[in-house]
């Protein structure tokens, strides 16, 4: 898995750090090089880290319910920055209130995300998807 780098962080005004650390550990143990930009991260910080490290994937976490607002336009900014083909994964409690996950997923896929995960998804699911999407 040499060279398979991913950028991991918690977007927006979200300070939920525990899940971020768990994901960092799980992806590292699975053999990925994790660039963890931590909490309170802007879209620009994700993109800058991805460019600087030649990452294959940006993984966005959001637990405070405003992920939909915070993630809007990320794919377009990636395209403008020359990394339009990068894989975009997002997961967590992405919206305020109780909404059908299938509807939330549709909206994030329409925003250009490749994978969307509901609250409570185990890291192994994302690891399996990473291996498929990166053809490992």
Swiss-Prot record:
Alphabetized UniProt keyword annotations: Cobalamin, Cobalt, Isomerase, Metal-binding
CDD domains: Glm_B12_BD (cd02072)
Coiled coil: none
PROSITE patterns (alphabetical): B12_BINDING (PS51332)
Pfam family name, one: B12-binding
Domain B12-binding: 3-136
Required cofactor names: adenosylcob(III)alamin
SUPFAM superfamilies: Cobalamin (vitamin B12)-binding domain
EC nos: 5.4.99.1
UniProt pathway: Amino-acid degradation; L-glutamate degradation via mesaconate pathway; acetate and pyruvate from L-glutamate: step 1/4
Positions that bind adenosylcob(III)alamin: 13-17, 61-63, 93-97
Gene3D superfamilies given in the database record: Cobalamin-binding domain
Quaternary state and interactors: Heterotetramer composed of 2 epsilon subunits (GlmE) and 2 sigma subunits (GlmS). GlmE exists as a homodimer and GlmS as a monomer.
Protein task: Catalyzes the carbon skeleton rearrangement of L-glutamate to L-threo-3-methylaspartate ((2S,3S)-3-methylaspartate).
Family the entry assigns: Belongs to the methylaspartate mutase GlmS subunit family.
HAMAP family associated with the record: Me_Asp_mutase_S
Name listed for the protein in its UniProt record: Glutamate mutase sigma subunit
Lineage: Bacteria, Bacillati, Bacillota, Clostridia, Eubacteriales
Gene from which the chain derives: glmS
């Amino acid at each position: 898995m040499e060279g398979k780098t991913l950028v991991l962080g918690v977007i927006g005004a979200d300070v939920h750090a525990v899940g971020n650390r768990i994901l960092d550990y799980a992806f590292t143990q699975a053999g990925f090089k994790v660039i963890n930009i931590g909490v309170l991260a802007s879209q620009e910080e994700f993109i800058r880290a991805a460019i600087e490290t030649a990452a294959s994937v940006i993984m966005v976490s959001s637990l405070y319910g405003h992920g939909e607002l915070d993630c809007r336009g990320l794919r377009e900014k990636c395209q403008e920055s020359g990394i339009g083909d990068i894989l975009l994964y997002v997961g967590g409690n992405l919206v305020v209130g109780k909404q059908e996950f299938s509807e939330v997923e549709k909206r994030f896929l329409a925003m250009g995300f490749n994978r969307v995960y509901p609250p409570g998804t185990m890291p192994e699911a994302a690891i399996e998807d990473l291996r498929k999407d990166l053809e490992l």
